[in-house]
């Protein structure tokens, strides 16, 4: 990247020989402390950079509201009683699993002493190998269209929603 943007103020992840967690903390501290034009990190490090517990709570609540809207839509529009029960049960199970997973992440982050990704002042994300972030959770009345979702896709969704909401960007 330096050959393409020689005058750019950029931070590139490097390994110092200390633990990966220490390297990641150092990188997050540098990213938060300076006004970088470009920060380059590996996919694994990006995934380990968590959002703040407060933002994750907001995200969790927003997604749970989406689940509730889907459940209400089924209740209001599904004519067949058996189909209504089956779809409601399936969505409630997905909702409960999502909520449990998010609560575990929030608890883990709350106990940690890490700098959250949302304090790094980043305002744009470019993802190489985007196919690694596929399979975001999807709720549907049709079981074949419903998707459980991957943690990696959810992590990227959290960060992109943050940028869209906080920064007003449409990334």
Predicted features along the sequence, with ranges:
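SF2 helicase/translocase NTPase motor core
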Residues: 1-160
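A short helix->loop->beta-strand "cap" motif at the edges of active sites that frequently abuts
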Residues: 122, 167-171
């Amino acid at each position: 990247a330096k050959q393409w943007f020689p005058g750019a103020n950029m931070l590139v992840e490097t390994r110092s020989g200390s633990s990966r967690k220490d390297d990641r903390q150092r990188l997050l501290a540098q990213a938060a402390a300076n006004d970088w034009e470009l920060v380059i990190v590996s996919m694994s490090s990006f995934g380990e950079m968590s959002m703040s517990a407060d933002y994750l709570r907001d995200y969790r609540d927003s997604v749970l509201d989406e689940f509730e809207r889907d459940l209400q839509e089924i209740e209001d529009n599904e004519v067949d009683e058996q189909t209504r029960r089956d779809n409601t049960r399936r969505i409630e199970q997905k909702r409960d699993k999502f909520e449990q997973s998010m609560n575990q992440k929030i608890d883990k982050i709350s106990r940690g002493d890490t700098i959250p990704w949302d304090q790094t002042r980043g305002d744009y994300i470019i993802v190489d190998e985007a196919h690694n972030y596929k399979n975001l959770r999807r709720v549907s009345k049709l079981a074949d269209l419903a998707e459980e979702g991957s943690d990696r896709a959810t992590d990227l969704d959290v960060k992109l929603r943050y940028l869209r909401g906080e920064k007003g960007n449409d990334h």
